[in-house]
């Protein structure tokens, strides 16, 4: 079979009626992990319910309903295959926790597909001041999704249908606003499609003979093509950060009879392997890793993206918990954050945020209240330029630099050093009121920590 294809994660964004579900459903349906039997079952149900037109959104509705009812779905349903990649759709907005998921990084998206509806009046609604198109694109950029594809959908419902003028108008408009946010339009494929009828999705449409194809210019290499599928194949595969020091935020800590304490989490950067001496922050507990397992098989080492359980000696379940971060004691070990500075974008807060505001922050797997100790500056969210020093307050739509102080021990990192540990969501009133990216962290010196016997024993063995 040769080498396995590279795995790519994408997130599909856009206004609620842009046709995200139909477009995504179409890809999964045509290239994906849904077997014929399931599709036939869906089709039959769709017809019985009078949704006889059975288009692809139905696939997605079914999957979503099952996911929300907590039925574990075969994750293959969210995957599809292209000539070059295995692509997983990690989430599509509309899911209430979409923003939180994107930030806490259940998975980091390698590319965002922005779906815009080209129908008369529809595009304008999505892009207007309060439309979601801008907000989603801004979010993707803020959270470090560096690549973007724009799918100009519903080309079959332009006036006249499949209008080149409308496609050009929308391409120009979207180019303008993604440029302001920080994407380079020259590196973004714009593809005119119909997610419903399949035009330019997998095959070139005969309805748009005027479309000569998309072309992008990038330092990693130029690319061109005609379909959305080819645009997905032009994604630049991510460099997984194995060469960075280890950071592994814990999702859970189990006590397993006969084995002992088993922390579980996803390697974000670096590698973890048996025999390594690791430090858990913010608790500052140091111990030796006895074994590393994934899917009940022991591994010689685990790399970024792997969800692993690992066994540690002489550490009780009381010592470490969800939100703790495991790191290599010898390579820039993780430490507790005393205070940190972050750039935040206030998204939907009904009032004003001023010094002293103490909401809950969701950062990697940690969930801890932090105090907005001081609003340092207000910045223009489009240009990033400072507009005011020490503002009295920040309100919805504002961006600013703030100093935060955790109310309980917390380990975070700057976004430039360890991206997955440097993004957070601010939660209040059961919603995401702001998102942030950490600029700098003042760490505690971490002098008083617990070092287990096995760590002391393991230490001299190392060179």
Swiss-Prot record:
Entry protein name: Elongation factor 1-alpha
GO molecular function, one term: GTPase activity
Region listing for G1, in residue ranges: 14-21
Positions of GTP binding: 14-21, 91-95, 153-156
Segments of this protein annotated with the region G5: 194-196
UniProt-annotated location(s): Cytoplasm
UniProt-listed Pfam families: GTP-eEF1A_C (PF22594), GTP_EFTU (PF00009), GTP_EFTU_D2 (PF03144)
Organism domain of life: Eukaryota
Compositional bias (Polar residues): 446-455
Region (G4): 153-156
Domain tr-type G: 5-242
Region (G3): 91-94
Gene3D superfamilies noted in UniProt: P-loop containing nucleotide triphosphate hydrolases, Translation factors
Species per Swiss-Prot/TrEMBL record: Caenorhabditis elegans
Keywords: Cytoplasm, Elongation factor, GTP-binding, Nucleotide-binding, Phosphoprotein, Protein biosynthesis
Assigned GO CC terms: cytoplasm
Family: Belongs to the TRAFAC class translation factor GTPase superfamily. Classic translation factor GTPase family. EF-Tu/EF-1A subfamily.
């Amino acid at each position: 079979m040769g080498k396995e294809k590279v795995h790519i994660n994408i997130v599909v964004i856009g206004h609620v009626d842009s046709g995200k579900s139909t477009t995504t459903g179409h890809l999964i349906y045509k290239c994906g992990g849904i077997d014929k039997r399931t599709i036939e079952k869906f089709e039959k149900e769709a017809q019985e319910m009078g949704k006889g037109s059975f288009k692809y959104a139905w696939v997605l509705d079914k999957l979503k309903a099952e996911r929300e009812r907590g039925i574990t779905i075969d994750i293959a349903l969210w995957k599809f295959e292209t000539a070059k990649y295995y692509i997983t759709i990690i989430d599509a907005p509309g899911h209430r926790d979409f923003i939180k998921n994107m930030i806490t990084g259940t998975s980091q998206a390698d590319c965002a597909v922005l779906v815009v509806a080209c129908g008369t009046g529809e595009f304008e609604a999505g892009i207007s001041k309060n439309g979601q198109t801008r907000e989603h694109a801004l979010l993707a950029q803020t959270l470090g999704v560096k690549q973007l594809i724009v799918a100009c959908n519903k080309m079959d419902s332009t006036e006249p249908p499949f209008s080149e003028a409308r496609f050009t108008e929308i391409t120009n408009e979207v180019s303008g606003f993604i440029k302001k946010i920080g994407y380079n339009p020259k590196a973004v494929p714009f593809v005119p499609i119909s997610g419903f009828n399949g035009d330019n999705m997998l095959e070139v449409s005969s309805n748009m003979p005027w479309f000569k194809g998309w072309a992008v210019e990038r330092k990693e290499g130029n690319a061109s093509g005609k379909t959305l599928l080819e645009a997905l194949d032009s994604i630049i595969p991510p460099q997984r950060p194995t060469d960075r020091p280890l950071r592994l935020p814990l999702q859970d800590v189990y006590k397993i009879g006969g084995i002992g304490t088993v922390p579980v989490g996803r390697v974000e950067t670096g590698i973890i392997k048996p025999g390594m001496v690791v430090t858990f922050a913010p608790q500052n507990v140091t111990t030796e890793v006895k074994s590393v397992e994934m899917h009940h098989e022991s591994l010689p080492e685990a790399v970024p993206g792997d969800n692993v359980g690992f066994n540690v000696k002489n550490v009780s379940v009381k010592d470490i918990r969800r939100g703790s971060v495991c790191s290599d004691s010898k390579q820039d070990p993780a430490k507790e954050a005393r205070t940190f500075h972050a750039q935040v974008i206030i998204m939907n807060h009904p009032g004003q945020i001023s010094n002293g505001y103490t909401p809950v922050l969701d950062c990697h797997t940690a969930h801890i209240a932090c105090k907005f100790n001081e609003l340092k500056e207000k910045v223009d969210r489009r240009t990033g330029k400072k507009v005011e020093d020490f503002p009295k307050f920040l309100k919805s739509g504002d961006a600013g630099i703030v100093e935060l102080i955790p109310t309980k021990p917390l380990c975070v990192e700057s976004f430039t050093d360890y991206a997955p540990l440097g993004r957070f969501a601010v939660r209040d009133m059961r919603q995401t009121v702001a998102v942030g990216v950490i600029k700098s962290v003042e760490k505690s010196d971490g002098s008083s920590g617990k070092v287990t016997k096995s760590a002391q024993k393991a230490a001299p063995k190392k060179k």
